[in-house]
Amino acid sequence: MFFRGRQPEASIWRRFRVSPDGFTFTHDDGYYTAHVVANAERVVDLFHTLSDELPPAIDVVMDDLRSGRSWKGESVALPDVRESVARLKNLLARYGGVELSAYTSEDQLTLNPYIELFIYARTDRWLYLLEGKGLEEQARVRSKSWKTNRQHFPAAPDLVNAVTAAAERLGLQPA
């Protein structure tokens, strides 16, 4: 056995994944758009982490495709939203089927039901934040190929109950 020094550590996740986590970043009509694709856990975690870059009061919309219910709230405290997302992270990553948007007049973060992250903004600051999280800008990303309609999401009563409880905790109103 030869010892050549310290080998760089590579996690199994990094070694055997199909493609690097990536995003597209475009600029049209005064708005920047980022579309982020990675594994489900990473996308949900990015939504939670990047939401910390929003101002202290944000607007929130939640749409549960399984139950068909939607909620909306204006000027909701960011720490409360982040706490609710933290509680939902595992269920969202596991089941999907919930669209969650946190936005202001300047920025919008949207986690879609297929567990992809979209960012809409008036400035390009999100490009640098995404690169800082280790994501690679790509010409195009492979969208989730398993997109289905509402009837094809697997039953997830735990997620439906957790989303309903989160909407109540945040004081969101039915949309």
Predicted regions located by residue number:
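Structured alpha/beta or helical-core interaction and ligand-binding surfaces enriched in interleaved
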Residues: 1-116, 120-175
